From Swiss-Prot:
UniProt source species: Rattus norvegicus (Rat)
UniProt subunit comment: Interacts with SCAP; interaction is direct and only takes place in the presence of sterols; it prevents interaction between SCAP and the coat protein complex II (COPII). Associates with the SCAP-SREBP complex (composed of SCAP and SREBF1/SREBP1 or SREBF2/SREBP2); association is mediated via its interaction with SCAP and only takes place in the presence of sterols. Interacts with RNF139. Interacts with RNF145.
Record-given protein name: Insulin-induced gene 2 protein
Residues in the Lumenal compartment per record: 52-70, 127-129, 176-189
UniProt PTM comment: Phosphorylation at Ser-151 by PCK1 reduces binding to oxysterol, disrupting the interaction between INSIG2 and SCAP, thereby promoting nuclear translocation of SREBP proteins (SREBF1/SREBP1 or SREBF2/SREBP2) and subsequent transcription of downstream lipogenesis-related genes.
Signal peptide: none
Length: 225
């Protein structure tokens, strides 16, 4: 090599641990964003279903309802969906119980369809009393968990999410931040916990499936390296 010529410095390669940590953190952010937009979309769709029952804050006009004064509701639902979807696989790893029951996208899509169907039933089907209505929705929600989840952690998180979300919703209503147009507020309270439980199970399944896809991609990259 001639004098005066300097060897160009080679780019330093990151170690496998740093690369893995970086890719995992980026994937978590991506999963969170995907879950957020899924939650926003489902919140808008389910709100349009509930308009048929006239129990939401929004006026009957469909287009106006999406851009009503309660604009913060879909983003809040999206944020909650992201937290729930990231929490489920995290709890599975912490407990050392990876969820392997019906781990394919077709099952997840059926779970979403059943969840929307439960919401549609709460908006369309009339019952003689609120207790009968609550019992039916509870059976449907537990059936959704049994069909698409069957994990103890999933059931426990679903119950916790339903309780916490119901309490927060009632506090918002009592403080005048949010309100329902339905004259029968007992009717609204009869289906809220069941809908929140089913929603938690649904978003948990989506989050688990996204996490499993991430693990497959990372495993394939590690084998290639």
């Amino acid at each position: 090599m001639a004098e005066g010529e300097t060897e160009s410095p080679r780019p330093k390669k990151r170690g496998p641990y740093i690369s893995s940590v970086t890719s995992q953190s980026v994937n978590v952010v991506i999963r969170g964003v995907v879950l957020f937009f899924i939650g926003v979309f489902l919140a808008l769709v389910l709100n349009l279903l509930q308009i048929q029952r006239n129990v939401t804050l929004f006026p009957p006009d469909v287009i106006t309802s999406i851009f009503s004064s309660a604009w913060w509701v879909p983003p809040c639902c999206g944020t909650a969906s992201a937290v729930i979807g990231l929490l489920y696989p995290c709890i599975d790893r912490h407990l050392g119980e990876p969820h392997k029951f019906k781990r394919e996208w077709s099952s997840v899509m059926r779970c979403v369809a059943v969840f929307v169907g439960i919401n549609h039933a709460s908006a369309k089907v009339d019952f003689d009393n609120n207790f009968q209505f609550s019992l039916t929705l509870a059976a449907l929600s537990v059936g959704l968990w049994w069909t698409f989840d069957r994990s103890r952690s999933g059931f426990g998180l679903g119950v916790g999410i339903a309780f916490l979300a119901t309490v927060v919703t009632q506090l918002l209503v009592y403080n005048g931040v949010y309100q329902y147009t339905s004259p029968d507020f007992l009717y609204v309270r009869s289906w809220l916990p069941c809908i929140f439980f089913a929603g938690g199970i649904t978003m948990g399944n989506i989050g688990r499936q996204l996490a499993m896809y991430e693990c497959k991609v990372i495993a394939e990259k590690s084998h290639q390296e």
